[in-house]
Every structure is written in C-alpha cells, then in structure tokens.
Amino acid sequence: MTSTIPTPPSIPFLGHVASIEREVPLRSFRLLSEQYGEIYELNILGRKLLVVSSAKLMSDVSDDKNFYKNMSGPLLQVRNAVGDGLFTAYGEEPNWGIAHRLLMPAFGTASIRDMFPDMLDLASQLVLKWERFGPKHRIDPAEDFTRLTLDTIALCAMSYRLNSFYRDSSHPFVQSMVDFLVECNLRANRPGLLTSVMVQTNAKYEEDIKTMTELADEIIAERRRNPTDKKDLLNIMLYSKDPKTGQSLSDVNIRNNLLTFLIAGHEPTSGLLTFALYYLIKNPEAMRKAHEEVDEVLGDQQIQLTDIGKLKYIDAILRETMRLSPTAPMRTVRPFEDITIGDGKYFVPKDYTVVINTIVAQRDPTVWGEDSNEFHPERMLDGKFEALPPNAWQPFGFGMRACIGRPFAWQEAIIALAVLLQKFDFVLDDPSYELELKQSLTIKPAHFYVHALPREGKPQLLATPSAAPFSSHARETTNASLPASPGTEAKQPMYVLYGSNTGTSESFAQRIANGAAARGFRATLGTLDSVADHLPTDGPIVIVCASFEGEPADNAAHFVERLTSLQDKPLQNLRFAVFGCGHHDWFRTYQRIPKLIDQTLEDRGAQRLVPRGEGDAGSSEFFEAFEAWETKLWEVLPEEYNTVVKQDITSGLKVETVGEGATRAVDLRQHDAALGTVIENRVLTAPGAPQKRHIEFELPEGVTSRAGDYLAILPSNPPQDVHRVLARFGMLPEQQIVISSSGPSSLPTGRQISAFDLLSGYVELSQPATARDVRTLLNVESSDATKESLKALLESYSDAVLGRRLSILDLLEQYPDIKLLFAAYLALLPSMRTRQYSISSSPLWNAQRVTLTVSVLEAPALSGRKEPFLGVASTYLANLRPGDKVQMAVRASNAAFHLPQDPRTPLVLFAAGSGLAPMRGFLQERALQKKAGREVGRAVLFFGCRSPDEDYLYSDSDLKEWEELGVVELRPAFSRALEKSEGCKYVQDRVWHDRRALDGLYEAGAKWFVCGSGKVARGVKEVLTAMIKESRGYSDEEAAAAFERATVGRFATDIFE
C-alpha cells in the first residue's frame, strides 16, 4: 500500500505560489525538503508537481525506460528563444534525434582533446588580465569566468573570437542572456494572463531574444562568407548529414542549436568555476592541497594536455563543487505510465511532473554522511567516487538527455582552475562573506568578490615591503591605511591584525591602532586572513585573536592554515607580538589558536617582540591583562624602531565643531550588516520579574539563517547615557562636528555628524575604565584632591573601579574638575561593537524572518548612581518598535551547534533563562517537520528559570503545543518554586533527579546541546560526569576522562555571560 505524499498548506487558486521565493526559488525548495522530507507535492497556479529530494528517489526516477524529460516551467519558456535545440527539444521532435546523432562525435574524447590549445589560449588571457590588474583589484569571478567560458565555446565550437577580455564591459549577448533567463524563471511562476499585460517586460524580453539571435546569425553568416575545413561543431551542423535518416539540419534548427550551445555551453561552466573558487577560499586545507598538486604536476611550466589526467585533486575539487552546488540544481521528468517509486511507497500517475531537487539529493546524509553539507574533495578520491550508489551524483543530468557537453566543460574547467592556482593565491574581498545565490535557469554565487595575489617563491607567505597585502574591502570596513592629516610626517609602518567573531579582539586591535600615531607609527588595521598569503615585513606585526572551541575565528582560518603549512624558517625578517583572548570555561581549547600562532611564527624564524599576552574573558581582570600587555608593547616598539613618542593623548585625533545641524549620518560600519525591520516586540515575563522579550525581525533581502545561528545587532547607547556625556562637555545634541585622524579610526572621519549620533552609535560609553584610562585622567589638569582620589582608585583598581563598573563618564561626573577635552575623551573610548544573540526560530517557520529571545539588563548601578545600569544592546532592543530599522547580520554559530541532518536523531537540551533561544529554534524545526509527516527523534529539554508564573518562557504557547505534539519532554527547574519542579532548584539538579529518563539516549546517537552562562555549562558537565561515575563505577578522574571521550562530536555548548 502506498503512502500519502505530504503537501504544504495552499491558497485557493494560487496553490503554493506564496511558498516559493521569487528571487531565489531554490531556497524555498530546500527548506520545504527539510520540513517535508524526501518527497512532497506542490500546486503552482494549477500546475501540480512532485518534488523528490533524496538520493534514493533521484535514482528511482533516473530511468529512461520509465521516465522522460519534461519540458515545463522555466525550460519551456527558454524555447521562446532556442526552439527545438538539443537542450529544449521534446524527445519526439525529429530534430532532437538528428542533432544528437550529428553532434555527439563533436564532444567525443578525440575532439575535446583537439580543443586544448584554444582552451589554454583563453585561460591564459584571464591569467594575464588578473596579473595586470594586480592584487589590489577587486575581481568579480562570476563575470570574468563568464567571459572565459563564453569565449571558449565560441572559439572551440564555432572558431569565432568574441574577444571579451578586450572589452570594458561584458558582451551584449551576456546581459541579454542573463535578463532573458531571469524572465523565463519568473514567467514560469506567473499567471499567463498577468504576463500578457506586462508590456514593457515583454518588449525587453523580445529585445533580449533579438540580441542573442543576432549574434548566432552573425556567427553563421561569418562562416558562410569564410568557409573552413575545420571540423568544428558549426561545420558539422552546416554540412553534415544524419547517418540514420540522411537529413541535414534546417537553417532554423542550426540557429537554435547555436544559441543553445552559446547559452548552455558557457553558463554552467562559469558557475562551476565560481563556486569552486569560493569553496577553495573558504576551505584553506583544500586550497593548500590544490596548490601542492599543481606545483607538483606543473611546476613552473605551462600546462600540457597530458597533465590533465594527473590533476586528480583538481578533478575531485570540481566533482565536490558540483555535488554541493550543481549549477543546474533541478530538473524535471514524467513517467510514461503509472508507476510507484521508493520501493513501492509512493504512487506517481502517468505524465505527472516530477521535479528532481538535485542540490538537496546530492547532500543526502545516507549516501554522503553527516558532513554532507561540508566541502571535502577527498570523498571523490581513491575509488570513493566510483563506489557511490547508482545515480547519486548527477549534476549533468541523466541518460539520453544528460548534458552532451560534459567532457568539454570538464576539460575547460580543469585547465582554467589549474593555471589560475599555478599563478595566484586568492583571498576574499570581504573576509566575512558567506555564500549567497543568484538564480536564473542556473545558479551562481552572488556578491562574491576576491583578490588574486601573485604566488612568488611557492609556498610564500612573505611579501616585499612595497606589496599591498590588504584587500580593498578590508580597508573600507576598518578604515585601515587612512592617509595622515595634512602636514604630518611619514611614520614607521606597523600592522595590527585581528581574528575575531564577537568583536572583542577587533576592539582591542582598534585600540592599539588608535594609539600608534602618538608613538610614531603609521598603523594599518586588518583581519588575519587579509594577509594570509603575504605578510609585510617593513614593520612590526601585532596580532590580537581568539579561539572558538579550539578553532580560529572566521576571518583568521585561512591565515592559520597557511601559517601552519610553512616549512623551514621563511619568516626570519618578520617581528611580531601576539595577544590572545579566551574563556577558561573552554579549558580544553583555552588560548589554543593564539598559542599556535605565537609558537609557529617563532618556529618559522620570526622574532617575538614581547611575550604572548593572555586575556581571560571569564575573569574580572580581562581588560587589565590586555592593558598590561599593551603597556609592555608600547615600551618595546618605540625603542626597537627608534620612533618619537608624543605625550599629548589627543595626538592623531582632532574634533572640530562646525555649527548646528539636523542631519544624522547612517554609517554601516560592520561589513556584513544590512537593514532589517522589526515586526514584533513583546514581553515574555510577568511584571516584576527580570524582563525577557520576544522580538521578531524581517531579515535584509537575500540573508538566510539556520536554527542555531546568531543574529549580530549593531546597537545604540541608551539615550540617558548620551545625554550625560553631552551635559558633561556642554554640547547640544544637534551640534555638528568633524573628526580628522592621522591613523586608522572607527570614528566617522572627514564629514559632519551630530554629537548625539556620534555618541549613540560609534563608541562604548559604559565599559569600565581601564587602569590606563585612570592614569590618563590623573595626568590631566585637576585639583590635588581629585588627583589623590584617582591615585587611590589605581591602588585598588580591581575593587574600586572594575568591581563597581566605573566608566570614564562616571569618573568625569564624580570629579567635575578634570579638564579633559572632548577629543581626548573620544580617543579613550572603545569603538561600538556588535552583540550576537542566538536566533530562537527556524527558517522552516519563515525563511525571511527570525526571532530573538532576549534578557533585558537593568540593574542597580554598582557605581552608586541613582539611575539603574542599562545594558547597551538589550536596552536598545527592548525599545524597538514595529517598523524600526536595525543594522544586523546573520552569523553562523559553531558548526557543531546545529541540528543533525537526520531529524530522527534524539536531542538532549539544557538551557536557563534566555539560553532557551536556540533550543526554541531547534524544537520549532522539529515540530514543523513532524507536522509535515516526518519522523522525528525524541527530545528532552531541561530548562531553568525562577518560577512557572514569572519566567517560564513560552510555557503557555510554543512549548505547551510542542509537548502535546510529542516533539519534546519538558523537565523544568524552578529556583524559587522547588515544589513545582520535583524539589530541583537548578538545571543540573533536575538532570540528576531525572537521570534514568536519559537511559539509552546516548546509545541511540543523541546530540547534547547546552546554552546559558558558564555556571550552567559547568553544572551540566559535572552532573553528566557524575552520572558516568555512578553507572560505570569510575573514579572522579576516570569519569572526567570518559566524559571527554564520549562527548567528542556529540556535545555542543553556547556560553554567554
């Protein structure tokens, strides 16, 4: 008996049109697959179809005996230009058989090998272009690969040179083709009646077809005017006869097929190369192996035809790229007769449209493993590719209607990738870039830009002093390498580099860069990845970085991989200093990356300027540790480099007031931030309880998320604090000022900005004053009594300043006779940083929206002020109203802190307070999957809060519904209502009480997630260790070791303070 095929809720007459994203429909199909599983049914304006998304079902419908290629949707619209060309012809059309038989030999092995010189010629033109533009040039790989592949198909198949690399802009054919394919996609999902009245759109559509057709006609006319004996594809179409029927192709069909090859012969290959470059840059180990293979096979010699077969790893890179991102991500078939698929589980009627969701099916964990979403070319090597189940890898389609030009595209791609890797290293223009898609008939990366750095002395990490190691984007986003103010002398270069996910290391790096000018240095600020391939040697390198569960920050991964791959001592001309940030709760990996960088630099010949510094974010002396290290650094650097130190703390920063004004600047200072919109903001807790809020946002266009990811928010300071500063310095909120700086600065330099906007959005006002800040105030003119008080504060800094969280502003208000200038005050303040909050929703609920579950910090001021202390970001969020715009960015959490791909995997969740956020997202996803008919694994949630009446978040809504649905078992711990939680006060108490309920979950493959404070995480670890000790009869040491072994890859934490 067959099973019912699930279908999403629909709208009368429209069906599921509203469920499909307009710009990138593929994202919607992927999310529907995650929710409904391997098969689901859609109704698009009355056109019904089945979507299959598993390797098994993809294989079942890849059967020429029982299924035929379906010409519908966007592909049907493409026929408006290419008619019965090979790609779009119906199987029963005579011209398809004639063209297929005629042209198959043209793509045989011998013919493709003969095209090698022309392919190399054009790949060399691309290399030459990137060499001449140099490493500072921002490259759009998709655009240049389109030039390459279009020119290649035209030259190799038609002996026609388009000379795209000698044009300032793309060939007119390209833009017309792109617009045409986009409109084909839109027409497929638009009512025909609506299309018929879109006069301007239709006129543009016809004009695009005309532009493409004119090029095809010109190529044919050129060949007829100048015949050749070359047996290229064009000559075969013009002069050959079908061996079976004796017929020739008609002039119309020749044009149709010429257009087909111009479109299909270049668009997928340019996408393949663009995706491959993206995956290599994002996976430094794969990039290193690719360079090693190219160096071993090619050396410094030009690639030869015989080299192609030796480039096994390059071949694996392309295969893995096409697995993860097949440029034709979906195809459709129909059965000749009624049939069942999935071992008889699903019934498919005759001629019913079946959409093969290739991009999802090729990530099926049953074939590719739990890491199927990750890029690992090794899975295509050593016989693994050949051992795959039938039809598991199908980026070129299947059977008789598979891509005829696959051998052509593959040879072209191997040549191009090999010669580019032989010549260049590549870095992202925006180090934080994550893959975005643009979709027409095919897909490509969107907004993807890189820099090509010439490889010298392979493997090379050093650059000459004159080299420009930083990408232009890095300079934009960090204000690095700002020119000195007029009249300032040239200074000794220094390079301040950071690896930071949360912004702390970046903030410390910015502080060092801010202080450089006063010490005679011209600082350049950038990410570690921005110098991954070329470290400058004409000045000191100062590194501030962190570890994230033992791994480098996102903008330092490439640097770490490149550094650790060096051999011998190539860094003897380099001088460096390293400060590491970390948190002692991650004791196994504490300071791992800072230690690794520091030691490896020394091992490879670099000279350490000062001992590595350590800052523990879990310690009350975190900022003091950095300050002590920074003080030592500034003692050493001027002496080592013979620079002049100025005593004026305002050196390098000037503030000019320019009169009143009303214009407020909007400055997106986080490179990946864009504007989202507040949809809802409501309180979750009872009156009198510490406030927690549920906030819903509309994401910026094109931004996607996963359950477990973070939403980074760029906040503003509480208005009460801003007004305190204005009052202290006697300024009006509307006062317009202009800032100039002789060094890199995160402040808005060189333009007018109001004092209120500056203080609201660019600096941190409430961070505790550092000991250095207090010493600075001590050196400013004030009364003797004030100086004595400041000295006393310094002597007991930890208790008197840090313990009371006294900010610079608090001190200035407490001692009003300190004559500190406003510019000097700004120079002391750290730059505003983003705050990351765990997303508390799943994209299966709404792909365009996310929710946050936030604790609002409002507590008595430890400084003694009457007004309460307000958390900067939480106060900002609490005061948002629907419709407000917010600067935000989705940032991936640790790879382990995501749901397992198989929804049947059990979950054990531990959370307290707003730490429930990611768990809510996980459970929401599981609930939606279960409602869609999928089998989901058991989930147990241990949640800590005060009481069921005060702050048991979502207990009367989502959690109640999901418990009733059978998605989750709720096991709360109420710290102020123990009688309502089995006498358990904290999460770990409830875990111990209910420990028998967890029997068998580990053996069933459960994943364990913790989100909350360090105290919560430690408590959970201790109780789980105690459970191991009890069940196994282990000693404390044995139980602790067993916990460490058992949790590898199965236990993920997200700790916040």
Swiss-Prot record:
It holds the Pfam family NAD_binding_1. It catalyses: 2 oxidized [cytochrome P450] + NADPH = 2 reduced [cytochrome P450] + NADP(+) + H(+); an organic molecule + reduced [NADPH--hemoprotein reductase] + O2 = an alcohol + oxidized [NADPH--hemoprotein reductase] + H2O + H(+); dodecan-1-ol + reduced [NADPH--hemoprotein reductase] + O2 = 1,5-dodecanediol + oxidized [NADPH--hemoprotein reductase] + H2O + H(+); dodecan-1-ol + reduced [NADPH--hemoprotein reductase] + O2 = 1,6-dodecanediol + oxidized [NADPH--hemoprotein reductase] + H2O + H(+). Residues 494-634 form the Flavodoxin-like domain. PANTHER family: BIFUNCTIONAL CYTOCHROME P450_NADPH--P450 REDUCTASE, NITRIC OXIDE SYNTHASE-RELATED. It comes from Phanerodontia chrysosporium (White-rot fungus). Binds 1 FAD. Binds 1 FMN. Residues 671-900 form the FAD-binding FR-type domain. It comes from the Eukaryota. Its cofactor is FAD; FMN; heme. Its EC number is 1.14.14.1, 1.6.2.4. PROSITE patterns: CYTOCHROME_P450, FAD_FR, FLAVODOXIN_LIKE. FMN binds at residues 500-504, 578-610. Residues 465-488 are annotated as: Disordered. GO terms for molecular function: aromatase activity; flavin adenine dinucleotide binding; FMN binding; heme binding; iron ion binding; NADPH-hemoprotein reductase activity. Keywords: FAD, Flavoprotein, FMN, Heme, Iron, Metal-binding, Monooxygenase, NADP, Oxidoreductase, Transport. Heme binds at C403. Self-sufficient cytochrome P450 monooxygenase that catalyzes the regioselective in-chain hydroxylation of fatty alcohols (C9-15) as well as fatty acids (C9-15) at the omega-1 to omega-7 or omega-1 to omega-6 positions, respectively. Is also able to convert naphthalene to 1-naphthol and 1-naphthol further to 1,3-dihydroxynaphthalene. In the N-terminal section; belongs to the cytochrome P450 family. SUPFAM superfamilies: Cytochrome P450, Ferredoxin reductase-like, C-terminal NADP-linked domain, Flavoproteins, Riboflavin synthase domain-like. Disulfide bonds: none annotated. The keyword Iron applies. One of its GO terms (cellular component) is cytosol. It is an enzyme of class 1 (oxidoreductase). This is Self-sufficient cytochrome P450 monooxygenase CYP505E3.
